[in-house]
Amino acid sequence: MDDRTVVVTGGTRGIGRAVVTAFADAGATVVFCGRDRAAVEDVAEITGAIGVRADVRDEFDVERLMETAAREGDGEIELVVANAAVNHGTPGKMPIAEEPYSRFDDTMRTNVRGIFTTIVEALPHLASDGRVLVPSGSIAREAKPNMGTYAISKAGSEAVVRAFATDIEQPVCIVDPGLVATELTGVDTARDPEDVAPMFVWAATEATEDEINGEIVDLRTWKKATR
């Protein structure tokens, strides 16, 4: 991946950080963002990737992120991983009827509009053979009690993926790594983010466009293709 430029939003923790590390280790030019400047600087120092403090709720931040990535690479971006997301509250303890308007609005602005913004701002720089990957999970498709706005936002983000997959030339897909131990899921007994990061590398490099465009790439799909 020495000649490829990869952008990862939400790259300072969890899956995002693991994906930044995986692509940097593969030789790609990786540009990532996060809200916390200190965390961005820490990940950049550890991985050798290029960190930008940016908030996906702000389209001007995202525009600057994509311009930085194009400038640092070969003028184009070959891969975008639209990973940034929030989950306000404790999973399983967020009855939707009790969700504050402010929490609903911020979750949707980050997890749905943030995906939209990331793809829109990437498009002027996205290579003709570029790809967009968006992490999601079964919570977007299978209702579970007390998951609050997070579940709704994930369903919304998948709808955004399907719309772009239909409308643009480059493939856009959902990557569902199953339950992963992150701050968003609130569990620490699931898969480690580092164990699922190779899914993203496979979807970016080995999977065919027909295999991924508008599709959900889950663990079964990945393991079947790589065993």
Residues covered by each model-derived region:
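C-terminal helical subdomain
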Residues: Q170, I174-V175, G186-R227
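Catalytic Tyr-X3-Lys loop
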Residues: A97-F116, S157
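Amphipathic alpha-helical dimer-interface segment in Rossmann-like NAD(P)H-dependent oxidoreductases
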Residues: E67-R71, M108-G130, T166, T205
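The beta1-alpha1 cofactor-binding region of Rossmann-like NAD(H)/NADP(H)-dependent oxidoreductases
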Residues: A38, R53-E67
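Conserved mid-core segment of classical short-chain dehydrogenase/reductases
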Residues: N87-D105, N146
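Conserved glycine-rich cofactor-binding loop
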Residues: T12-R13
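Catalytic loop of short-chain dehydrogenase/reductase
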Residues: S128-G156, V161-T166
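Conserved glycine-rich Rossmann-like NAD(P)H-binding loop of the short-chain dehydrogenase/reductase
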Residues: A26-D42
